[in-house]
């Protein structure tokens, strides 16, 4: 059985990586991304090619339940 969840990943100006439920919008003044729902922070070494200057990345998180 698999469950899939769509989320958005974005890196802030300081290099920190975050996941959002909706596509976030860039806030240049604060050098961060903002969305209705912030989900969680992500290990900074993940998505090494994703930079502050890039648009958020849409990803699918798949939960795999082993029997």
Predicted segment positions?
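N-terminal helix-cap/turn-to-beta initiation motif at the start of protein domains
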Residues: 1-5
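A short beta-strand micro-motif
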Residues: 6-12
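Short, surface-exposed terminal/edge motifs of secreted or surface/virion proteins that either
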Residues: 16-28
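Low-complexity intrinsically disordered segments
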Residues: 28-67
